[in-house]
Protein backbone atom coordinates (compact mmCIF):
# COMPACT_ATOMS: atom_id res chain seq x y z
CA UNK A 1 0.00 0.00 0.00
CA UNK A 2 2.88 2.34 0.84
CA UNK A 3 4.65 1.54 -2.40
CA UNK A 4 1.56 2.39 -4.39
CA UNK A 5 1.35 5.79 -2.69
CA UNK A 6 5.00 6.57 -3.59
CA UNK A 7 4.41 5.56 -7.22
CA UNK A 8 1.37 7.80 -7.45
CA UNK A 9 3.27 10.77 -6.00
CA UNK A 10 6.14 10.30 -8.49
CA UNK A 11 3.69 10.17 -11.42
CA UNK A 12 2.06 13.43 -10.32
CA UNK A 13 5.47 15.15 -10.06
CA UNK A 14 6.48 14.10 -13.60
CA UNK A 15 3.18 15.30 -15.03
CA UNK A 16 3.72 18.72 -13.44
CA UNK A 17 7.16 19.00 -15.10
CA UNK A 18 5.79 18.13 -18.55
CA UNK A 19 3.79 21.31 -18.60
CA UNK A 20 6.84 23.49 -17.92
CA UNK A 21 9.27 21.98 -20.51
CA UNK A 22 8.45 24.37 -23.43
CA UNK A 23 9.65 27.29 -21.29
CA UNK A 24 13.16 25.83 -21.22
CA UNK A 25 13.66 26.30 -25.00
CA UNK A 26 13.80 29.76 -26.63
CA UNK A 27 12.67 30.72 -30.09
CA UNK A 28 15.50 30.78 -32.68
CA UNK A 29 15.73 34.58 -32.98
CA UNK A 30 15.97 34.99 -29.21
CA UNK A 31 18.57 32.27 -28.94
CA UNK A 32 20.81 33.93 -31.57
CA UNK A 33 20.59 37.27 -29.82
CA UNK A 34 22.18 35.94 -26.65
CA UNK A 35 24.94 33.77 -28.16
CA UNK A 36 27.45 35.35 -25.86
CA UNK A 37 29.52 33.33 -23.48
CA UNK A 38 29.60 35.08 -20.10
CA UNK A 39 32.40 34.65 -17.70
CA UNK A 40 31.21 32.96 -14.53
CA UNK A 41 32.83 32.30 -11.22
CA UNK A 42 34.10 28.83 -10.60
CA UNK A 43 32.08 26.82 -8.20
CA UNK A 44 33.52 25.52 -4.96
CA UNK A 45 34.21 22.06 -6.39
CA UNK A 46 35.83 23.51 -9.57
CA UNK A 47 38.33 25.47 -7.50
CA UNK A 48 39.50 22.20 -6.01
CA UNK A 49 40.21 20.66 -9.44
CA UNK A 50 43.54 21.23 -11.32
CA UNK A 51 43.45 23.92 -14.08
CA UNK A 52 41.94 22.75 -17.37
CA UNK A 53 42.43 24.73 -20.61
CA UNK A 54 39.22 23.36 -22.05
CA UNK A 55 37.14 24.14 -18.97
CA UNK A 56 38.75 27.46 -17.99
CA UNK A 57 39.28 29.12 -21.39
CA UNK A 58 37.21 27.26 -23.98
CA UNK A 59 33.94 26.67 -22.17
CA UNK A 60 34.32 29.97 -20.31
CA UNK A 61 36.30 33.21 -20.63
CA UNK A 62 39.49 33.07 -18.60
CA UNK A 63 41.89 35.74 -17.33
CA UNK A 64 45.65 35.91 -17.90
CA UNK A 65 46.17 34.73 -14.32
CA UNK A 66 43.94 31.71 -14.87
CA UNK A 67 45.80 30.85 -18.07
CA UNK A 68 49.09 31.17 -16.20
CA UNK A 69 47.82 28.70 -13.60
CA UNK A 70 47.26 26.22 -16.42
CA UNK A 71 50.59 26.66 -18.29
CA UNK A 72 52.71 27.51 -15.23
CA UNK A 73 55.21 29.16 -17.64
CA UNK A 74 55.39 32.88 -18.46
CA UNK A 75 56.50 32.54 -22.10
CA UNK A 76 53.98 29.82 -22.98
CA UNK A 77 51.25 31.78 -21.24
CA UNK A 78 52.02 34.94 -23.25
CA UNK A 79 52.13 33.00 -26.53
CA UNK A 80 48.71 31.53 -25.74
CA UNK A 81 47.32 34.84 -24.49
CA UNK A 82 48.22 36.77 -27.65
CA UNK A 83 46.45 34.18 -29.79
CA UNK A 84 43.52 33.77 -27.35
CA UNK A 85 42.88 37.45 -26.75
CA UNK A 86 43.75 38.90 -30.20
CA UNK A 87 43.38 36.03 -32.64
CA UNK A 88 46.19 34.38 -34.58
CA UNK A 89 47.57 37.00 -36.98
CA UNK A 90 49.55 34.28 -38.76
CA UNK A 91 46.45 32.23 -39.56
CA UNK A 92 46.26 33.68 -43.08
CA UNK A 93 49.92 32.74 -43.81
CA UNK A 94 50.97 36.30 -44.76
CA UNK A 95 54.70 35.52 -45.15
CA UNK A 96 55.67 34.76 -48.74
CA UNK A 97 58.58 32.93 -50.35
CA UNK A 98 59.03 30.48 -47.49
CA UNK A 99 59.14 33.08 -44.72
CA UNK A 100 58.17 32.03 -41.19
CA UNK A 101 55.53 33.96 -39.25
CA UNK A 102 55.51 34.95 -35.57
CA UNK A 103 52.21 36.13 -34.11
CA UNK A 104 52.21 39.49 -32.32
CA UNK A 105 49.54 41.56 -30.61
CA UNK A 106 47.43 42.93 -33.50
CA UNK A 107 50.38 42.27 -35.80
CA UNK A 108 52.93 39.70 -36.94
CA UNK A 109 56.59 39.44 -37.91
CA UNK A 110 57.92 37.62 -40.96
CA UNK A 111 61.37 36.08 -40.81
CA UNK A 112 62.56 35.98 -44.42
CA UNK A 113 64.87 33.41 -46.02
CA UNK A 114 68.12 34.56 -47.61
CA UNK A 115 67.56 36.61 -50.73
CA UNK A 116 64.19 38.08 -49.72
CA UNK A 117 63.08 41.09 -47.72
CA UNK A 118 60.05 43.25 -47.04
CA UNK A 119 57.08 43.19 -44.66
CA UNK A 120 55.87 39.86 -46.10
CA UNK A 121 59.19 38.69 -47.64
CA UNK A 122 57.71 39.78 -50.96
CA UNK A 123 60.83 41.47 -52.37
CA UNK A 124 63.50 39.51 -54.17
CA UNK A 125 66.75 41.30 -53.31
CA UNK A 126 68.26 40.29 -56.63
CA UNK A 127 65.58 42.24 -58.47
CA UNK A 128 66.57 45.37 -56.50
CA UNK A 129 70.25 44.96 -57.37
CA UNK A 130 70.44 47.69 -60.00
CA UNK A 131 73.06 50.34 -60.69
CA UNK A 132 70.68 53.14 -59.72
CA UNK A 133 70.37 51.62 -56.24
CA UNK A 134 73.60 52.28 -54.28
CA UNK A 135 75.72 51.73 -57.41
CA UNK A 136 74.45 48.14 -57.49
CA UNK A 137 76.67 47.38 -54.50
CA UNK A 138 79.74 47.64 -56.76
CA UNK A 139 82.98 49.05 -55.38
CA UNK A 140 83.76 50.91 -58.60
CA UNK A 141 81.80 50.62 -61.84
CA UNK A 142 78.34 49.14 -62.38
CA UNK A 143 76.85 47.95 -65.67
CA UNK A 144 73.53 46.41 -66.70
CA UNK A 145 72.87 43.41 -68.92
CA UNK A 146 69.26 42.75 -70.05
CA UNK A 147 69.71 39.02 -69.54
CA UNK A 148 72.08 38.70 -66.60
CA UNK A 149 71.13 41.85 -64.67
CA UNK A 150 73.68 44.16 -63.13
CA UNK A 151 77.39 43.40 -63.16
CA UNK A 152 80.41 45.13 -61.61
CA UNK A 153 83.69 46.03 -63.27
CA UNK A 154 86.86 47.85 -62.31
CA UNK A 155 89.10 50.68 -63.47
CA UNK A 156 92.31 49.94 -65.34
CA UNK A 157 94.90 48.71 -62.85
CA UNK A 158 92.29 46.83 -60.80
CA UNK A 159 90.73 43.36 -61.07
CA UNK A 160 87.27 42.21 -60.04
CA UNK A 161 87.37 39.81 -57.11
CA UNK A 162 85.55 36.53 -56.53
CA UNK A 163 82.69 38.25 -54.69
CA UNK A 164 81.77 40.00 -57.93
CA UNK A 165 81.75 43.49 -56.40
CA UNK A 166 85.22 44.26 -54.98
CA UNK A 167 88.21 45.60 -56.93
CA UNK A 168 91.82 44.82 -55.99
CA UNK A 169 94.90 46.56 -57.46
CA UNK A 170 96.92 44.65 -60.03
CA UNK A 171 99.75 47.20 -60.18
CA UNK A 172 101.99 48.64 -57.50
CA UNK A 173 100.69 52.19 -57.79
CA UNK A 174 97.08 52.11 -59.05
CA UNK A 175 95.16 55.31 -59.64
CA UNK A 176 93.04 56.77 -56.87
CA UNK A 177 95.04 55.34 -53.98
CA UNK A 178 97.27 57.28 -51.58
CA UNK A 179 100.36 55.08 -51.12
CA UNK A 180 101.54 56.64 -47.86
CA UNK A 181 98.12 55.96 -46.32
CA UNK A 182 97.71 52.52 -47.86
CA UNK A 183 100.95 51.51 -46.19
CA UNK A 184 99.54 52.70 -42.88
CA UNK A 185 96.52 50.41 -43.42
CA UNK A 186 94.23 53.28 -44.25
CA UNK A 187 93.34 56.59 -42.68
CA UNK A 188 90.53 59.10 -42.50
CA UNK A 189 90.00 61.33 -45.55
CA UNK A 190 91.71 64.74 -45.34
CA UNK A 191 89.98 67.26 -43.12
CA UNK A 192 88.15 70.19 -44.01
CA UNK A 193 93.70 77.20 -50.34
CA UNK A 194 91.16 79.46 -48.25
CA UNK A 195 90.05 78.07 -44.91
CA UNK A 196 91.78 74.77 -45.67
CA UNK A 197 94.51 72.76 -44.01
CA UNK A 198 97.95 71.70 -45.08
CA UNK A 199 97.77 68.47 -47.05
CA UNK A 200 100.19 66.14 -45.22
CA UNK A 201 103.20 65.21 -47.29
CA UNK A 202 102.32 62.50 -49.81
CA UNK A 203 98.57 62.60 -49.17
CA UNK A 204 97.75 64.51 -52.38
CA UNK A 205 100.01 62.44 -54.66
CA UNK A 206 98.25 63.41 -57.93
CA UNK A 207 98.67 67.16 -57.39
CA UNK A 208 100.78 68.80 -60.12
CA UNK A 209 102.27 72.29 -59.99
CA UNK A 210 102.61 74.05 -63.34
CA UNK A 211 105.47 76.55 -63.47
CA UNK A 212 106.17 79.21 -66.07
CA UNK A 213 109.71 80.55 -65.99
CA UNK A 214 110.08 78.95 -62.56
CA UNK A 215 107.02 80.65 -61.00
CA UNK A 216 103.69 79.10 -60.03
CA UNK A 217 101.22 79.36 -62.90
CA UNK A 218 98.42 76.90 -62.14
CA UNK A 219 97.61 73.55 -60.65
CA UNK A 220 96.98 70.28 -62.42
CA UNK A 221 96.13 66.61 -61.88
CA UNK A 222 98.23 63.61 -62.82
CA UNK A 223 95.99 61.07 -64.60
CA UNK A 224 98.79 58.96 -66.08
CA UNK A 225 102.60 58.83 -65.90
CA UNK A 226 102.86 61.30 -68.80
CA UNK A 227 99.52 63.12 -68.62
CA UNK A 228 98.23 66.07 -66.60
CA UNK A 229 94.72 67.59 -66.72
CA UNK A 230 94.42 71.33 -66.07
CA UNK A 231 92.31 74.36 -67.07
CA UNK A 232 92.42 75.92 -70.56
CA UNK A 233 92.38 79.49 -69.24
CA UNK A 234 95.80 78.94 -67.64
CA UNK A 235 97.43 79.03 -71.09
CA UNK A 236 95.61 81.92 -72.77
CA UNK A 237 98.58 84.29 -72.54
CA UNK A 238 101.29 81.68 -72.92
CA UNK A 239 103.89 82.94 -75.38
CA UNK A 240 106.43 80.14 -75.16
CA UNK A 241 105.69 76.53 -74.27
CA UNK A 242 109.41 75.91 -73.78
CA UNK A 243 109.42 77.62 -70.38
CA UNK A 244 106.47 75.59 -69.04
CA UNK A 245 107.16 72.70 -66.67
CA UNK A 246 105.12 70.41 -64.41
CA UNK A 247 106.31 69.35 -60.97
CA UNK A 248 104.97 66.22 -59.24
CA UNK A 249 105.71 65.20 -55.66
CA UNK A 250 105.89 68.85 -54.59
CA UNK A 251 104.79 69.82 -51.09
CA UNK A 252 106.73 72.69 -49.51
CA UNK A 253 107.71 75.36 -52.06
CA UNK A 254 110.35 76.82 -49.76
CA UNK A 255 112.64 73.81 -49.82
CA UNK A 256 113.61 70.69 -51.73
CA UNK A 257 112.33 67.60 -49.90
CA UNK A 258 113.33 64.78 -52.26
CA UNK A 259 110.18 63.40 -53.94
CA UNK A 260 109.88 66.29 -56.44
CA UNK A 261 109.97 65.37 -60.14
CA UNK A 262 109.99 68.20 -62.71
CA UNK A 263 109.16 67.54 -66.37
CA UNK A 264 108.97 69.78 -69.41
CA UNK A 265 105.50 70.07 -70.98
CA UNK A 266 105.62 68.77 -74.56
CA UNK A 267 101.99 69.28 -75.61
CA UNK A 268 99.12 71.50 -74.54
CA UNK A 269 95.74 70.42 -75.92
CA UNK A 270 92.54 72.41 -75.40
CA UNK A 271 89.06 71.95 -76.91
CA UNK A 272 88.58 73.76 -80.20
CA UNK A 273 85.28 75.00 -78.77
CA UNK A 274 87.06 76.87 -75.96
CA UNK A 275 86.98 80.65 -76.49
CA UNK A 276 89.69 82.69 -74.69
CA UNK A 277 88.15 85.00 -72.13
CA UNK A 278 85.09 82.76 -71.80
CA UNK A 279 84.45 80.12 -69.13
CA UNK A 280 82.87 77.22 -71.03
CA UNK A 281 84.96 74.13 -71.95
CA UNK A 282 87.68 75.22 -69.53
CA UNK A 283 89.81 72.07 -69.63
CA UNK A 284 93.25 71.21 -70.99
CA UNK A 285 95.35 68.07 -71.38
CA UNK A 286 99.14 68.29 -71.05
CA UNK A 287 101.59 65.65 -72.21
CA UNK A 288 104.93 65.57 -70.40
CA UNK A 289 108.15 65.22 -72.36
CA UNK A 290 109.09 62.23 -70.16
CA UNK A 291 106.83 60.19 -67.85
CA UNK A 292 107.23 60.60 -64.10
CA UNK A 293 108.16 57.65 -61.90
CA UNK A 294 105.22 56.58 -59.77
CA UNK A 295 105.97 56.10 -56.08
CA UNK A 296 104.85 56.82 -52.54
CA UNK A 297 104.53 60.58 -53.21
CA UNK A 298 103.53 60.51 -56.90
CA UNK A 299 100.43 58.58 -58.04
CA UNK A 300 97.67 59.28 -60.58
CA UNK A 301 94.04 60.12 -59.89
CA UNK A 302 91.43 57.92 -61.62
CA UNK A 303 89.61 59.42 -64.62
CA UNK A 304 86.13 57.97 -64.01
CA UNK A 305 83.64 56.47 -66.40
CA UNK A 306 81.13 59.26 -67.30
CA UNK A 307 78.00 57.40 -66.17
CA UNK A 308 79.62 56.53 -62.85
CA UNK A 309 80.68 60.16 -62.39
CA UNK A 310 77.22 61.56 -63.16
CA UNK A 311 75.06 58.94 -61.44
CA UNK A 312 77.17 58.10 -58.39
CA UNK A 313 80.08 60.46 -57.73
CA UNK A 314 77.95 63.57 -58.30
CA UNK A 315 75.91 62.62 -55.23
CA UNK A 316 78.87 62.33 -52.88
CA UNK A 317 78.45 65.32 -50.60
CA UNK A 318 82.07 66.44 -50.04
CA UNK A 319 85.10 66.41 -52.32
CA UNK A 320 88.70 67.59 -51.91
CA UNK A 321 90.20 70.63 -53.66
CA UNK A 322 93.94 71.28 -53.36
CA UNK A 323 96.58 73.76 -54.48
CA UNK A 324 99.13 76.43 -53.57
CA UNK A 325 96.82 79.36 -54.33
CA UNK A 326 96.45 82.53 -52.30
CA UNK A 327 95.42 81.94 -48.70
CA UNK A 328 93.21 85.04 -48.79
CA UNK A 329 91.84 87.41 -51.43
CA UNK A 330 94.89 89.50 -52.46
CA UNK A 331 96.89 87.52 -49.92
CA UNK A 332 100.17 85.63 -50.14
CA UNK A 333 100.54 82.32 -51.92
CA UNK A 334 100.58 79.21 -49.75
CA UNK A 335 104.04 77.86 -49.01
CA UNK A 336 102.76 74.32 -48.44
CA UNK A 337 100.17 72.41 -50.42
CA UNK A 338 96.70 73.12 -49.02
CA UNK A 339 93.56 70.99 -49.20
CA UNK A 340 89.93 71.76 -48.37
CA UNK A 341 86.76 69.67 -48.43
CA UNK A 342 83.91 71.48 -50.19
CA UNK A 343 80.25 70.44 -50.55
CA UNK A 344 78.78 70.07 -54.01
CA UNK A 345 75.69 72.11 -54.82
CA UNK A 346 72.58 71.01 -56.64
CA UNK A 347 72.50 72.11 -60.28
CA UNK A 348 69.39 74.27 -59.75
CA UNK A 349 71.09 76.17 -56.91
CA UNK A 350 74.12 76.74 -59.12
CA UNK A 351 71.97 78.06 -61.98
CA UNK A 352 70.03 80.30 -59.62
CA UNK A 353 73.29 81.86 -58.46
CA UNK A 354 74.27 82.43 -62.08
CA UNK A 355 70.99 84.22 -62.86
CA UNK A 356 71.52 86.57 -59.92
CA UNK A 357 74.62 88.04 -61.61
CA UNK A 358 73.40 89.92 -64.70
CA UNK A 359 76.21 90.29 -67.19
CA UNK A 360 78.43 87.83 -65.31
CA UNK A 361 79.72 84.44 -66.51
CA UNK A 362 77.02 81.91 -67.31
CA UNK A 363 77.02 78.52 -65.61
CA UNK A 364 76.53 75.85 -68.29
CA UNK A 365 75.94 72.10 -68.19
CA UNK A 366 79.70 71.68 -68.54
CA UNK A 367 80.23 73.10 -65.04
CA UNK A 368 79.11 72.55 -61.46
CA UNK A 369 79.28 74.59 -58.25
CA UNK A 370 80.87 73.67 -54.94
CA UNK A 371 81.76 75.54 -51.77
CA UNK A 372 80.25 77.34 -48.79
CA UNK A 373 77.79 80.21 -49.05
CA UNK A 374 79.49 81.99 -46.12
CA UNK A 375 82.78 82.07 -48.03
CA UNK A 376 84.69 80.21 -45.32
CA UNK A 377 86.49 77.75 -47.63
CA UNK A 378 87.27 77.98 -51.33
CA UNK A 379 89.86 77.71 -54.07
CA UNK A 380 91.71 80.89 -55.06
CA UNK A 381 94.10 82.33 -57.64
CA UNK A 382 96.88 79.84 -58.22
CA UNK A 383 94.60 76.86 -57.53
CA UNK A 384 93.16 77.07 -61.07
CA UNK A 385 93.48 73.85 -63.02
CA UNK A 386 93.81 71.81 -59.83
CA UNK A 387 91.74 68.75 -58.93
CA UNK A 388 88.27 68.42 -57.51
CA UNK A 389 88.71 64.84 -56.24
CA UNK A 390 85.88 62.63 -55.00
CA UNK A 391 86.33 59.55 -52.83
CA UNK A 392 84.05 56.54 -53.29
CA UNK A 393 84.52 53.32 -51.34
CA UNK A 394 88.21 53.87 -50.81
CA UNK A 395 89.19 55.09 -54.30
CA UNK A 396 89.59 58.72 -55.43
CA UNK A 397 88.35 60.00 -58.81
CA UNK A 398 88.80 63.24 -60.77
CA UNK A 399 85.36 64.87 -60.90
CA UNK A 400 86.21 68.51 -61.57
CA UNK A 401 88.86 71.05 -62.55
CA UNK A 402 89.15 74.31 -60.61
CA UNK A 403 87.88 76.83 -63.17
CA UNK A 404 86.66 80.21 -61.97
CA UNK A 405 84.89 82.13 -59.23
CA UNK A 406 84.15 85.66 -58.09
CA UNK A 407 86.89 86.50 -55.64
CA UNK A 408 88.35 84.02 -53.18
CA UNK A 409 85.83 82.63 -50.69
CA UNK A 410 83.53 85.60 -51.28
CA UNK A 411 80.36 85.41 -49.18
CA UNK A 412 77.34 84.44 -51.25
CA UNK A 413 79.44 83.00 -54.08
CA UNK A 414 80.62 79.49 -54.83
CA UNK A 415 83.52 78.06 -56.78
CA UNK A 416 82.87 76.92 -60.35
CA UNK A 417 84.41 73.68 -61.62
CA UNK A 418 84.66 72.12 -65.06
CA UNK A 419 82.57 68.93 -65.12
CA UNK A 420 85.16 66.32 -66.11
CA UNK A 421 82.57 63.69 -67.11
CA UNK A 422 81.72 65.86 -70.14
CA UNK A 423 85.27 65.47 -71.44
CA UNK A 424 86.24 61.92 -70.41
CA UNK A 425 85.90 60.43 -73.90
CA UNK A 426 87.83 63.36 -75.43
CA UNK A 427 90.63 63.02 -72.86
CA UNK A 428 90.90 59.25 -73.26
CA UNK A 429 91.02 59.47 -77.04
CA UNK A 430 93.86 62.00 -76.90
CA UNK A 431 95.80 59.96 -74.34
CA UNK A 432 95.47 56.93 -76.58
CA UNK A 433 96.25 58.76 -79.83
CA UNK A 434 98.08 62.04 -79.08
CA UNK A 435 99.24 64.46 -81.79
CA UNK A 436 102.44 63.28 -83.46
CA UNK A 437 104.37 66.47 -82.76
CA UNK A 438 104.94 68.79 -79.85
CA UNK A 439 103.21 72.14 -79.44
CA UNK A 440 99.90 73.80 -78.65
CA UNK A 441 96.81 72.18 -80.16
CA UNK A 442 93.11 72.88 -80.38
CA UNK A 443 91.27 69.61 -80.88
CA UNK A 444 87.48 69.45 -81.46
CA UNK A 445 85.41 67.74 -78.81
CA UNK A 446 83.80 64.43 -79.70
CA UNK A 447 80.18 64.63 -80.87
Curated annotation (Swiss-Prot):
| EGF-like domain mapped to chain residues | 86-122, 127-168
Site note Important for S-92 for O-xylosylation, residues: 93
State how it assembles: Heterodimer of a light chain and a heavy chain linked by a disulfide bond.
- Could you tell me which cysteines form disulfide bridges? 57-62, 90-101, 95-110, 112-121, 131-142, 138-152, 154-167, 175-302, 199-204, 218-234, 350-369, 380-408
Q: What is this protein called?
A: Coagulation factor VII
Domain of life assignment:
Eukaryota
EC code: 3.4.21.21
Describe PTMs of this protein.
The vitamin K-dependent, enzymatic carboxylation of some glutamate residues allows the modified protein to bind calcium.
UniProt lists the gene as F7
Q: Which family does the entry's similarity section mention?
A: Belongs to the peptidase S1 family.
Is Transmembrane helix among this UniProt entry's keywords? no
Where in this chain does the record put each Gla domain? 41-85
Amino acid sequence: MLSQAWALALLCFLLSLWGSLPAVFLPQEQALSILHRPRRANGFLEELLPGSLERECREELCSFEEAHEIFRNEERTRQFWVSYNDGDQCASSPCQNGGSCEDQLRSYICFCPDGFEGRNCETDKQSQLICANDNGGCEQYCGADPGAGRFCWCHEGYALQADGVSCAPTVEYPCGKIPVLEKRNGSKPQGRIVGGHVCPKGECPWQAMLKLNGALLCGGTLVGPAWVVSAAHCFERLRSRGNLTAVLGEHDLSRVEGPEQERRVAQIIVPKQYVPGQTDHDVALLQLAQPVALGDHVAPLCLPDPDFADQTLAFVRFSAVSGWGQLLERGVTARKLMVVLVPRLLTQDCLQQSRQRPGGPVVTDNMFCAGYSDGSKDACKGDSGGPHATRFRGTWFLTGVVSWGEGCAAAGHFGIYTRVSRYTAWLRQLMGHPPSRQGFFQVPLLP
